[in-house]
């Protein structure tokens, strides 16, 4: 019984699908390296890595509770633990609260600026699941939530959030719109039936173009914002490789096949890793 319940809790937080928290982790670590002008130290690396995993897991709990009445009508999500009734709403909320408190405990080991910004991050995280009911581009709200590790990373290192952090957040928001639109393309038919709002529905026949434009803006903003990074040739090479991956994703989603769109979404963490690797190697080579 205990083992079964643990398995359901792990399924609730998508433990077997690390792509979700990796999408959060790479831009956060990139910001840590930029703010620190290199390796940020083991303390901050540990805090932000574990904090990212914990908050993404907490977000899954909140999201599944908020979407439980919608998810039962979507083939891909109908068997999620909360939707199927295997985990109660109360259990999911308690688990989410515990995970969020653990993440906050990590934040408390940093500084006052990071602690203050963590409340804003929490507010956006809680708002996203409900944005899908009222906002035609809820992926933009998710983009803010998934990018908030960037200003928090700068705050942890520099005790302030400079303009550069917000520029990087804006660029990263476009990346989130790109990959979450791919994700939304998988469920578009079901979402239309139940009245869910997504960028894939809003963009309509311009969905693929919207995805590719979002990739272009993301990579362009990050390339220009960090143009003066040490050993910039390494970073520019990484941006080029990330661009090739984006083009491949465009090829995958061109026919709007569900499996191919989902594959493109799942592979996005490699694009984020490529950008992070370029940043880390540039500072290492300096």
From Swiss-Prot:
It is a multi-pass membrane protein. This is 4-hydroxybenzoate octaprenyltransferase. It catalyses: all-trans-octaprenyl diphosphate + 4-hydroxybenzoate = 4-hydroxy-3-(all-trans-octaprenyl)benzoate + diphosphate. It is found in: Cell inner membrane. Its EC number is 2.5.1.39. PROSITE patterns: UBIA (PS00943). GO terms for biological process: ubiquinone biosynthetic process. Belongs to the UbiA prenyltransferase family. PANTHER family: 4-HYDROXYBENZOATE POLYPRENYLTRANSFERASE, MITOCHONDRIAL (PTHR11048:SF28), PRENYLTRANSFERASES (PTHR11048). The gene is ubiA. The chain crosses the membrane at residues 19-39, 42-62, 92-112, 115-135, 137-157, 161-181, 206-226, 233-253, 264-284. One of its GO terms (molecular function) is 4-hydroxybenzoate polyprenyltransferase activity. Pathway: Cofactor biosynthesis; ubiquinone biosynthesis. It comes from Polaromonas sp. (strain JS666 / ATCC BAA-500). Catalyzes the prenylation of para-hydroxybenzoate (PHB) with an all-trans polyprenyl group. Mediates the second step in the final reaction sequence of ubiquinone-8 (UQ-8) biosynthesis, which is the condensation of the polyisoprenoid side chain with PHB, generating the first membrane-bound Q intermediate 3-octaprenyl-4-hydroxybenzoate. Keywords: Cell inner membrane, Cell membrane, Magnesium, Membrane, Transferase, Transmembrane, Transmembrane helix, Ubiquinone biosynthesis. GO terms for cellular component: plasma membrane. InterPro entries: HB_polyprenyltransferase-like (IPR006370), Prenyltransferase (IPR039653), UbiA_prenyltransferase (IPR000537), UbiA_prenylTrfase_CS (IPR030470), UbiA_sf (IPR044878). It is an enzyme of class 2 (transferase).
């Amino acid at each position: 019984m205990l083992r079964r319940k643990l398995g359901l809790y792990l399924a609730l937080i998508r433990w077997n699908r690390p792509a979700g928290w990796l999408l959060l982790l790479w831009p956060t670590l990139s910001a840590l390296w930029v703010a620190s002008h290199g390796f940020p130290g083991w303390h901050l690396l540990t805090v932000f890595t574990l904090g990212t995993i914990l908050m993404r897991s907490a977000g899954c709990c909140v999201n599944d509770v908020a979407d439980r009445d919608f998810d039962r009508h979507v083939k891909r999500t109908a068997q999620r633990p909360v939707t199927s009734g295997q985990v109660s709403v109360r259990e999911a909320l308690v688990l989410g609260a515990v995970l969020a408190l653990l993440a906050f405990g990590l934040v408390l080991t940093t500084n006052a600026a990071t602690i203050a910004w963590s409340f804003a991050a929490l507010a956006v995280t809680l708002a996203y699941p409900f944005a899908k009911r009222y906002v035609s581009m809820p992926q933009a709200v998710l983009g803010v939530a998934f990018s908030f590790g960037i200003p928090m990373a700068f705050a942890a290192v520099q005790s302030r959030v400079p303009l550069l952090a917000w520029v990087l957040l804006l660029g990263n928001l476009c990346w989130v719109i790109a990959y979450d639109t791919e994700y939304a393309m998988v469920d578009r038919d079901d979402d239309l039936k139940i009245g869910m709002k997504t960028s894939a529905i809003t963009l309509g026949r311009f969905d693929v173009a919207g995805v590719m434009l979002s990739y272009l803006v993301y990579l362009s903003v990050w390339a220009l914002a960090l143009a003066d990074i040490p050993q910039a040739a390494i970073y520019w090479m990484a941006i080029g490789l990330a661009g090739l991956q984006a083009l491949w994703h465009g090829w995958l989603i061109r026919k709007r096949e569900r499996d191919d769109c989902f594959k493109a979404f799942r592979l996005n963490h490699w694009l984020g890793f490529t950008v992070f690797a370029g940043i880390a190697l540039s500072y290492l080579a300096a």
